[in-house]
Amino acid sequence: MPINIPNHLPAKQVLESEHIFVMDESRAFHQDIRPQKIVILNLMPKKIQTETQLLRMLGNSPLQVHFTFLIPSTHTPKNTARQHLDEFYTDFSSIRHKRFDGMIITGAPIEHLPFEDVSYWEELKEIMEWSKTNVTSTLHICWGAQAGLYYHYGIEKVELPKKIFGVFEHTVLKKHERLVRGFDELYYVPHSRHTDINTEQLQSASDLDVLSVSEEAGVCLIVSKDEKQIFLTGHPEYDTDTLLQEYERDIERNLSNVEAPKHYFAPGGKEPVNRWKAHATLLFMNWLNYYVYQETPYEWD
């Protein structure tokens, strides 16, 4: 089954060129199927790129999925055209009365700031509180995971002496959990962050289960006992060249101590090798199937 997206969304042409089944709104309207309703709170600066990456991950589902794109009303994006935001995005006040089957809260390049200093922190707290009653399952990514762990469980983020940057091997700890069903014992995930979560506080949180870890990148995948909150510290949705773009950007900015992403380039070469796409797709499919579709009633009360 296809993903259902607005007719003129830039990601539509890209996904169709990759033979991902995309259905526009007019065609989807005539299908007698209840689509899964997913709201994506997009906090990344390159919004079109993030839209495409996430839709690609969810585009192989046998389910019909309808997406709503959300941005904070208390923050003005600087890297995306106003016309695009006006056409494809909404704000929280427009959806707070609605219920959604799933929600994705993306990362954001603001990890150097205390959470309370983020311009839209109060609004984000309100959205995360709302998600507890109006969303079946919420997937938090990278900074979004750190923000969610801090808000829901009081787990703080900590500064790292050196940026975690590259593609790292992870070990599945609880292989029978539905979120990692079908995973190999070892799998790879891209990471790009200057902060980590406080592992001592995490270990004390009895309502959370850690599903996978990396010797180099730390804890990767965390799920609440009720399966409503999922936290992912890496970026499995990243394209093959996303880390390369970040690396070249940092070099152009003349940032100090810029290191090449680890375990990313082919041996002896300069071309990146994608070793995470299959597991990334499986992760998003497992979330959508087991934590969203199978847990949501056909009609919300």
Curated annotation (Swiss-Prot):
Catalytic reactions on record: L-homoserine + acetyl-CoA = O-acetyl-L-homoserine + CoA
Catalytic residues as annotated in Swiss-Prot or TrEMBL: C142, H235, E237
Entry-linked SUPFAM superfamilies: Class I glutamine amidotransferase-like
UniProt GO molecular function: homoserine O-acetyltransferase activity; homoserine O-succinyltransferase activity
KW Protein transport (keyword) present: no
Residues reported in the UniProt entry to bind substrate: K163, S192, R249
Keywords in alphabetical order: Acyltransferase, Amino-acid biosynthesis, Cytoplasm, Methionine biosynthesis, Transferase
InterPro entries listed in its UniProt record: Class_I_gatase-like (IPR029062), HST_MetA (IPR005697), MetA_family (IPR033752)
Record site feature (Important for acyl-CoA specificity), residues: E111
GO cellular-component term (any): cytoplasm
Keyword Acyltransferase assigned: yes
GO biological process, one term: L-methionine biosynthetic process from homoserine via O-succinyl-L-homoserine and cystathionine
Record pathway: Amino-acid biosynthesis; L-methionine biosynthesis via de novo pathway; O-acetyl-L-homoserine from L-homoserine: step 1/1
EC number: 2.3.1.31
Site label Important for substrate specificity, positions: S192
Pfam families with a match to the protein in the record: HTS (PF04204)
Subcellular location: Cytoplasm
Family annotation (NCBIfam families): metA
Function: Transfers an acetyl group from acetyl-CoA to L-homoserine, forming acetyl-L-homoserine.
Entry's family note: Belongs to the MetA family.
Official protein name in the record: Homoserine O-acetyltransferase
The species this protein was found in: Bacillus velezensis (strain DSM 23117 / BGSC 10A6 / LMG 26770 / FZB42)
